[in-house]
């Protein structure tokens, strides 16, 4: 995480921006919140969408416990892991498969990882697979990046973002979250809102991990802050 935050700060300096509005969606909200807590003097406002803490508990929720909502899809996801890796966390096992020297092993693991990604964000009957996963190069790169990050618990101490939320005091901002988000349950943004003085929690009742109504709210909030 230190390197990710340093990259953002280097970009800000390169662009000659003194203070800016930081926006993060999904894992980008983990990065955006962490950046704001470490460089609060450089953040004019902070907008987070589909927030999670990036902690081990949240990662285990997505890779294990969310399977209670999608049992058939999760069983397929889990069963792709060979017996000799079953004692590992699923995210660790998949990272090993994705880095296997055999391209066929890598590709099969990437397909199953992205299939599960599609499953746990599908909260409506008309949910469609993410078309980006049709690209084999993107699919493998995405799965590798996600598992590398998650197996390291986003390089954050447990619940670090919520515990350090007092550093966000004085920074105006909004947390926009779908009530039906099964990937990132509402308790994480609610706890951050409680710990972040002056923040606004916007709950979109009929959407999950993104959607048209949430995008509309994001645009509204960003326009109001600009």
Region roles according to the model:
Residues 29-40, 46:
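Short glycine-enriched nucleophile-adjacent loop
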Residues 2-20:
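Conserved acidic catalytic loop of the alpha/beta-hydrolase fold
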Residues 168-169, 175-177:
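Short beta-strand/loop motif that positions the catalytic acidic residue
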Residues 157, 182-188:
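Conserved alpha/beta-hydrolase "acid-adjacent" motif
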Residues 148-165:
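Active-site nucleophile elbow and catalytic-triad environment of alpha/beta-hydrolase enzymes
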Residues 163, 199-226:
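Catalytic active-site module of serine/aspartate enzymes centered on a nucleophile-bearing elbow/loop
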